[in-house]
Amino acid sequence: CWFIQRIGKKFASKDDVVDSRKILNKWKFLVPIAPIAGQTDFSKPIGFYYDGNTIVAKPGECSTESWLVAGTFDTEKEVKNFKSYLFTKISRFLLLQAVISQHVTRKNFMFVPDLGRYDKKITDDYLIKKFEISKSDWEYIDSRITKIKDE
């Protein structure tokens, strides 16, 4: 079971795990519920999610409420492609539009569309074409969200 970032992964008895959504045996992408803790100057670019604060959880792994299950999938490829989507500047910018505190919940993803299929890596270039984002809109998004290694 994945606990808070500082503790990491520890054993949890199956008797202590409630799987009401039937996702325990799926691949899961876990994101922290407080990804921007400590950032108070929102005039500077925001990062949100990156390799150091997210987890690809394997089937059979669970998490505490310190983590939000951002997506569940049947294959490792799908979860990694979904991760690439959430790591785009566009999806992180859309998430920022609904965030009013350091605490992120499922509701904050209201402007981040579910692409439905994650059979390939998702990039900002792909999303710019898909959503017909103008050059000026992209320049604004690019200025507000920090670049991360996986982009």
Give the residues covered by each predicted segment:
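Polybasic, glycine- and aromatic-enriched phosphate-binding surface used to engage nucleic acids
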Residues: 1-122, 126-132, 137, 143-151
